[in-house]
């Protein structure tokens, strides 16, 4: 049974019904409508914490979705799931795929930076300053790109860039 038919929350169910009605009226191909339905169900499963089900829906959406912009968000959400499960290498791969489809996706860049910053801090604690600096440099590069795309966002990242002497690389 599709996830949209199992929702017990009245507001969510109402939104889903309205979204289905709008989707049916839109002048787009049937395949695009199906891709969106899978994507929507994937987001609902992800929000409920059912990551395995969300991945199934997202993978079905990827099979059908032809639009690069829309595919970028599917890849991004798959990356979020893998990051939440601690599979950072897999998450990085999906964030990279999202950026290949849509280079103007600052949230993917931010998440790439967060993973590299986390890794840098971890190896720094283990007494490996050279490896830490490699990760911090990757984090800085990703945050700089994200801030350039969304200058009013990522304030903590901007502060980190300033306090580590990397902020001038932004300009």
Swiss-Prot record:
Keyword Flavoprotein listed: no
Record GO biological process: photosynthesis
Gene3D superfamilies (UniProt xref): Tetratricopeptide repeat domain
Residues in TPR repeats: 35-68, 72-105, 120-153
Predominant location category: membrane
Membrane topology: Peripheral membrane protein
UniProt xrefs under HAMAP family: Ycf3
NCBIfam families from the UniProt entry: PRK02603.1 (NF002725)
Name listed for the protein in its UniProt record: Photosystem I assembly protein Ycf3
The organism of origin for this protein: Gloeobacter violaceus (strain ATCC 29082 / PCC 7421)
Taxonomy of the source species: Bacteria, Bacillati, Cyanobacteriota, Cyanophyceae, Gloeobacterales
């Amino acid at each position: 049974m599709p996830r949209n038919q199992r929702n017990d929350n009245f507001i969510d169910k109402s939104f889903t019904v309205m979204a289905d009605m709008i989707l049916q009226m839109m002048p787009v191909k049937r395949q695009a409508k199906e891709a969106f339905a899978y994507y929507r169900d994937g987001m609902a499963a992800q929000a409920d914490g059912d990551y395995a089900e969300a991945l199934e829906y997202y993978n079905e959406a990827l099979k059908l979705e032809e639009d690069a912009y829309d595919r970028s968000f599917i890849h991004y959400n798959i990356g979020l799931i893998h990051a939440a499960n601690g599979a950072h290498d897999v998450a990085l791969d999906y964030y990279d795929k999202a950026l290949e489809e849509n280079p103007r996706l600052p949230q993917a860049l931010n998440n790439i930076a967060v993973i590299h910053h986390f890794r840098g801090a971890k190896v720094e604690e283990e007494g490996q300053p050279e490896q830490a600096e490699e990760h911090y440099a990757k984090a800085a590069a990703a945050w700089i790109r994200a801030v350039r795309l969304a200058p009013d966002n990522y304030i903590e990242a901007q502060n980190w860039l300033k306090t580590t002497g990397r902020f001038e690389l932004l300009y």
